[in-house]
């Protein structure tokens, strides 16, 4: 997103509205968090810079790698020090990418402005400092605030208990300020969060206890209460827990959460991974919040797998900047879907494409229809490569016409469900989007093979453009 510079700068970072952002410049670079943690390769995780300009000679290539100084971090999500929430502040500058490490609890701050094609390490926030001042560990999602502070959801205490989770505040110099939520107002589990200031509300979601999920997924842990099924509704910016929404058995493991981008809207969605439902949340007439299942992905009956039924596992989703389309992935099934959400209560399937998954042709796992027929999905080869793993993180271009896809979820879960990723690494694909009639099609000219990295195959996770995007920027 366009940034003003110099003495004539009259606005802060980003754009005044989501629709202005849609008309922003086409992406030329994308930053990708890449992981060696958990792979058995004793190398530091790194931030990859990928060239996504089709007119460039290095299109679809990694053009720079910034290794972090430690081993075993598990870089995961990323966010900015400033975004469109600071658009009204000319002194604010989108310069630093925040990289929380999910396993080590370190937080890296990366300077992307000195050389956008070759970012450099600016600061390391050490876990001891975070724990000493807040008791928090396992940092996940970061969002910048209009105040200039940075807020990071943390999933537990240093021992991996969910009970210690909450929200970390860093100041504009990346010093630990403390917790955001008021004492006694911590959520039961932590994961993602999104705020909608005009409705004075922040809502956070629930993964599970770090002591459980860091060891891999065990269905028994769900029954033992080690995974979440709640949304936590907070007053914004005060940090008071006002309401807890129990999503019940239809909302097990609610992960990514997004409001509609239009800041006047009082509705959004959360992707519930295990039950594979997109749940819509909304404000009611009395000012409280409620929820309903908006999209349901039925589990597939399968043969030759660990269970007789396979959930889709919705692990990521996003909403186009004009709030017309919602996109989500089914990490285990292997498809990416596009829904028209112009009527948010009634999403309509507009596009679907298979780009991996456990039931693709050539896999030992087969799906079984109700009448007993078996089938497997057709997955295209791209530049001679058969897609590995399943679609996991996604990022959409500002104009809504290109969707980028990586395939690593979390190293221990990758090893459990897609062991070939450990041996062959991740990749990144690009899907062309029809925004008029709907439809998704794999771009045959784009394939980034993180299996061919100089230090060995790595796992690619979240993607960010230098100028912000539909999953980093919040309008006030």
Report each predicted region and the residues it spans.
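Structural signature of eukaryotic scaffold interfaces centered on beta-propeller domains
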Residues: 2-26, 74-93, 135-147, 194-200, ...
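Short loop/turn segments immediately following beta-strands, especially the blade-tip
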Residues: 49-58, 109-120, 173-174, 233-239, ...
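Beta-propeller domains
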Residues: 2-11, 19-127, 160-163, 171-174, 183-345
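Short, conserved, GDST-rich strand-edge loop motifs in beta-rich repeat architectures
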Residues: 19, 23-25, 32-42, 88-95, ...
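Loop/turn-rich, solvent-exposed surfaces of beta-rich toroidal or solenoidal domains
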Residues: 265-283, 307-421, 426
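Asp-box/WD-like beta-propeller blade repeats and closely related beta-sheet repeat scaffolds
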Residues: 112-197
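Surface-exposed loop and turn segments in beta-propeller and other repeat-based domains
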Residues: 61-80, 122-135, 180-188, 241-251, ...
